[in-house]
Amino acid sequence: MARYTGPKSRIARKFGEGIFGADKVLSKKNYPPGQHGNSRKRKTSEYGIQLREKQKAKYTYGVLEKQFRNLFEKAATAKGITGEVLLQMLEGRLDNIVFRLGIAPTRAAARQLVGHKHITVDGQVVNIPSYAVKPGQLIGVRERSKSLEVIANSLAGFNHSKYAWLEWDEASKVGKLLHIPERADIPENIKEHLIVELYSK
């Protein structure tokens, strides 16, 4: 399955929440898209609920099925609660950290910046969006990329104290992953236990 590149509002309506950020369409059309979207909802099966939660997580973090499955398998063998470890791994992806630091306005934009070699880790260019950032590593903007409009606009007025597990130096345009976030600190509305139940079948 290829990464979804269609209207984000359509996906937001599918899940009934702005998984890509604030969505004005939801205030007007808070029901699923399609011909029968505004009709009475049918009861969803347990499997359907679990699958929906997995899809929500994949869309939120912009991860393909194979990548998501691989992350789950790693989380399942790691120390800790599988669902929480899975979310922590998703949060630790380079593209997500670039987004959380305010360098990019969306995760999709963050993936592009990483892929186009605008981002560095510990001073070295890294162009792999799924790169797993470790605590203590420095995430920065390549010198020649600091004047890019998308980066400047995204950083303007961004609240860098928003996430306690990240640190930002405005002068050097460098951020730092202080520690892996606890589940309670991750703001995404994802019921990870449903994903664990789905993969455990």
Swiss-Prot record:
Q: Which residues form the S4 RNA-binding domain?
A: 92-155
Task: Cite the residue spans of the region called Disordered.
Answer: 28-47
**SMART domains, per this entry?**
Ribosomal_S4, S4
Could you list the residue ranges forming a coiled coil in this record? none
Determine the domain of life of the protein's source: Bacteria
Stated role: One of the primary rRNA binding proteins, it binds directly to 16S rRNA where it nucleates assembly of the body of the 30S subunit. With S5 and S12 plays an important role in translational accuracy.
Indicate the family of this protein.
Belongs to the universal ribosomal protein uS4 family.
Q: What name does this protein carry? A: Small ribosomal subunit protein uS4
Q: Which organism is it from?
A: Bacteroides fragilis (strain ATCC 25285 / DSM 2151 / CCUG 4856 / JCM 11019 / LMG 10263 / NCTC 9343 / Onslow / VPI 2553 / EN-2)
Q: What is the lineage of its organism?
A: Bacteria, Pseudomonadati, Bacteroidota, Bacteroidia, Bacteroidales
Gene giving rise to this polypeptide: rpsD
